[in-house]
Amino acid sequence: ATCDILSFQSQWVTPNHAGCALHCVIKGYKGGQCKITVCHCRR
C-alpha cells in the first residue's frame, strides 16, 4: 500500500520508496523499495 499512496516519482525525490523503506524497517528488515506498486523488503 505504501507504493500506491505516494506513487509518484521525480528526478529528486521518490516518497513512495521512502515510505516503503520505513515500512520495512519497522517490520525488522534493512529497508525496501517499490517495484511497480509492490513494496519489496530487503533482508
UniProtKB/Swiss-Prot annotation:
<keyword id="KW-0211">Defensin</keyword>
<comment type="similarity">
    <text>Belongs to the invertebrate defensin family. Type 1 subfamily.</text>
</comment>
<keyword id="KW-0929">Antimicrobial</keyword>
<feature type="disulfide bond">
    <location>
        <begin position="20"/>
        <end position="39"/>
    </location>
</feature>
<feature type="disulfide bond">
    <location>
        <begin position="3"/>
        <end position="34"/>
    </location>
</feature>
<dbReference type="InterPro" id="IPR036574">
    <property type="entry name" value="Scorpion_toxin-like_sf"/>
</dbReference>
<keyword id="KW-1015">Disulfide bond</keyword>
<dbReference type="InterPro" id="IPR003614">
    <property type="entry name" value="Scorpion_toxin-like"/>
</dbReference>
<keyword id="KW-0399">Innate immunity</keyword>
<dbReference type="GO" id="GO:0005576">
    <property type="term" value="C:extracellular region"/>
</dbReference>
<keyword id="KW-0391">Immunity</keyword>
<keyword id="KW-0044">Antibiotic</keyword>
<dbReference type="Pfam" id="PF01097">
    <property type="entry name" value="Defensin_2"/>
</dbReference>
<dbReference type="GO" id="GO:0042742">
    <property type="term" value="P:defense response to bacterium"/>
</dbReference>
<comment type="function">
    <text>Antibacterial peptide. Affects Gram-positive bacteria M.luteus, B.megaterium, A.viridans, S.aureus and S.saprophyticus. Moderate activity against P.acidilactici and B.subtilis QB935. Also affects Gram-negative bacterium, D22 form of E.coli.</text>
</comment>
<feature type="disulfide bond">
    <location>
        <begin position="24"/>
        <end position="41"/>
    </location>
</feature>
<keyword id="KW-0964">Secreted</keyword>
<dbReference type="GO" id="GO:0045087">
    <property type="term" value="P:innate immune response"/>
</dbReference>
<protein>
    <recommendedName>
        <fullName>Defensin</fullName>
    </recommendedName>
</protein>
<dbReference type="InterPro" id="IPR001542">
    <property type="entry name" value="Defensin_invertebrate/fungal"/>
</dbReference>
